[in-house]
Amino acid sequence: MVLNLDTENRKMQDGNNDDDFDLEVQIPNSIFEKLKSIEALKARESPMCVSGKDDSIPTCDQNSTPGMITQRSCVYGGARVVLMPITDAVHLVHGPIGCAACTWDIRGSKSTGDKLYKNGFSTDLQEKDIVFGGEKKLYESILEVNKLYHPGAIFVYSTCVVGLIGDDLKAVCRQAQEATGCRVIPVQSEGFKSFNKTAGHKLACDAMLDYVIGTEEPEEEHPYSINIIGEFNVAGDLWGIIPLYEKMGVKVHTAITGDSTVAKVASAHRSKLNIVQCPKSSNYLAAQMDKKYGIPSFKVNFFGLDETTKSLRAVAEFFGDEEMIKRTEELIKSEIKNLRDEISEYQKDLSGRTVAIYSGAHKSWALVSAFGELDMEIIMSGTQNGKPEDYQQIRDHVCEGTLIVDDASSMELVQLLKEYKPDILISGAKEKYLSLKSGIPHCDFNHDRITAFSGYQGFINFARVVHTAVMTPIWRLSRKMMI
């Protein structure tokens, strides 16, 4: 099957009439010709579109198309990535060993203190447990890990199998908490609850709201204290943000959940402001904390110089302290001045280069400004689990003619890369090797990366990694061999 993106089809899908449909006037026909050459299942036509003057977005937030191999994660995986960075907690997976194995250290989060979260724990359900139930095994497992590790809390994750056999997770956790005196927190994250792992993010946030946040008081209250929500300290990202706010005179009480502890999250309700780095995973949490504790929130973005600057200024303006505002402007001026020369060197080689992004919904549009500062052009942007509002953000940030795609399979991505020939693909580890095998340089921006990309210094690190990937001589040789 070949993608059919002719004018009539687009009119039918978007609901546009002849008077307001003028997409082809704005976008070169060559863009549509590229898409028409991509082989795909017929049901996969509408999850791809080209940004233009109309308001069309890909069909999204639906079950994956039968017959294609999706790269999506499950609800359990969505819950796991939100809670795992709590450093002094045990994360116990109630299910088969494979569920724990495939999510072990899934976030790549770093810690300044406890490393307990780096361990993987599972009840390792077997066939007999499926027949007779796994509640006793779960109870004994909780008692054992508490005796061995004395954690700040034990998060117990439900998986698909547990949902099918009907183990009462909440009852077992309640009994185990009474027996141990340790917080034992059920996370009802059966993987089959939704096709979108974002449901798992919400379940993880509910677990924190119901059992952790608001249960302790901070050691001291600061007049300018904030929580950074949706920041998971991947590769140490958080450590490029906190020092900036400290220089402004702002106290970062905790990130939720990067490099956090149970006690810090428990006392987060006393902070004066929540700033949200990843709205996909944490908008819900910020909204609920506002509703329950009266903590206002707004979105920030620490990827790129301009976005980092806006995020610092927004916090200073929120508190309205004149001295803080003055310090913030001096800090911004100093930080950018120190980086201009190095950025210019990278721009010389990267200017005009093209980029494809296939990553989380937030990063798929949040990186647009950062690449603009390197004078690079985004020609494709997509995600596995985007919702309509995510694709509207992408559409609003990218240039006309940019391909926007939802839930692409490996086959489709390979064809898109070969057809569009970007100078680099920004994605996660799942797409890394298909990109490299296609002769396309790759930059890992997801959980497996080892370099911090947030804040001013993080942007320099990012520019360096992108520059190294694009300018490596092997690509000139490999492309000649592939022709």
From Swiss-Prot:
It comes from Methanococcus maripaludis (Methanococcus deltae). Coiled coil: none annotated. GO terms for molecular function: nitrogenase activity. Keywords: Nitrogen fixation. Pathway: Cofactor biosynthesis; Fe-Mo cofactor biosynthesis. The keyword Lipid biosynthesis does not apply. Belongs to the NifD/NifK/NifE/NifN family. SUPFAM superfamilies: Helical backbone' metal receptor. GO terms for biological process: nitrogen fixation; protein-containing complex assembly. The lineage of its organism: Archaea, Methanobacteriati, Methanobacteriota, Methanomada group, Methanococci. This is Nitrogenase iron-molybdenum cofactor biosynthesis protein NifE. Pfam families: Oxidored_nitro. This protein may play a role in the biosynthesis of the prosthetic group of nitrogenase (FeMo cofactor). Residues 1-20 are annotated as: Disordered. Gene3D superfamilies: Nitrogenase MoFe cofactor biosynthesis protein NifE, C-terminal (3.40.50.12380), Nitrogenase molybdenum iron protein domain (3.40.50.1980).
